[in-house]
C-alpha cells in the first residue's frame, strides 16, 4: 500500500526518468532491544488514597500517570522518586514495570513492593526499536551527480519512530520519501537516537552506493553535497583529515566514512576494518568528529562519543530481536550479545571548535557508525551490507 508522503521536493519522478543512470537497493533492520545493564524494575507503596513510586525512569510524568491509573487514584496523589538508571536509552520512557509494581502493592496496602524483572523478562518484553524495510532509487546525471532520490519506508509501530526522510543530510534537488506504518502486536518505542540509527545506516549507505556508481571517492562525493550544511561539512572534513583519508593502509584494511546531523548536533565517523576469509569483520579503529557548540566538559564529550560508538558497534555487528511463532527468541546476553572489551577498537574523538551554544552529544554519534563500517566493508570486499546485524556468512570469501 502507498505510504504517507513525508518529504516531497522538486519532481523526483521526472528527474528519475531523465537520469543518465538509476540505482536501486533494499535495506532492512530488525527490531532492537535496549539491552539495559539494570533490568526493568520499580518499587511502590500504596497507602490510603495515595501512591509512592521509586523508579529509575526517564520521565516522571508517565510514571505518575500509569501509577495513578493502576491504583485508581488522582495523579496528584502519586509521588515519584526518580532514581539514576543503570542504562535507559529510551526504554524507560515506557513504565510497564511501574504498573506491575503498583498493581502488586495495591493488594497489600502499607507494604512496600519492589519488582525486579529478570534479564529474560527485560529482553523479551521490550519496547523495541521498530523493524524497518527500505526501498530506494537514486538517479545520477551524466557527470555522476545525484539528481533524484526516492525512498519508501515501511515499518512496524508508531510512524514517528520509522523516519521521515528529513534525516537525509545530502543536497539532492529532487526528493520523494513516503512512510507506511503497520500496526502489529509488538511493542515499540524510542531507542537511542530514535529514527537516526536506522535512517543513518540507510541514507548514508545508499549515498555511498551512488558514489560508487558514479566512480567517485565517497568522501569527495559526500563533501560536494554538504554545501548547505557547513557544520556537518566541518565534521566530515575534520574526521577525514584526522583519519588520514586517502593514505595507504595495512594490507587487507579499508575505511568507510559517514556523516549525519541529529538533534541540533552533527557527527561524522571513519571506520577502519578488515574482513577475514571466514567473513569475520574486525573494526581496527574508529575516528569521530562532532560539532556540539561550545565545549563545556571535554572528557564528558569524549566519554559520550565512545559510549555511543560502543552501543552502535553492538547493533551493527552483534544483535537484533527475532520473532518466532509469535514470541521473542533472544533472552540474555548469550543470544543477544554486546561488544566486549577485547573486541572494542580504539576510538579517537575530535571536536569542531565553536563558540555557539552547547548542543547534545549523547545521541548524535550513534548513527554514523553502522554506515561507516558497512561502507568500509564494501571498500574491502566489494560486497554491500544492506541488513543489520552483519552476518559473517554474507561476507565469506
Set out the residue ranges of the language-model regions:
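Glycine-rich, small/acidic residue-mixed loop/short-helix segments
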Residues: 308
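C-terminal structured "cap/appendage" subdomains that terminate the fold
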Residues: 355-374
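Substrate-binding beta-hairpin/strand module that engages nucleic acids
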Residues: 118-120, 324-342
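Short beta-alpha connecting loops at secondary-structure transitions
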Residues: 187-192, 256, 293-302, 359-362
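Generic long, charged, amphipathic alpha-helical segments
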Residues: 334-360
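Structural alpha/beta core scaffold segments of enzyme domains
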Residues: 1-291, 324, 346, 350, ...
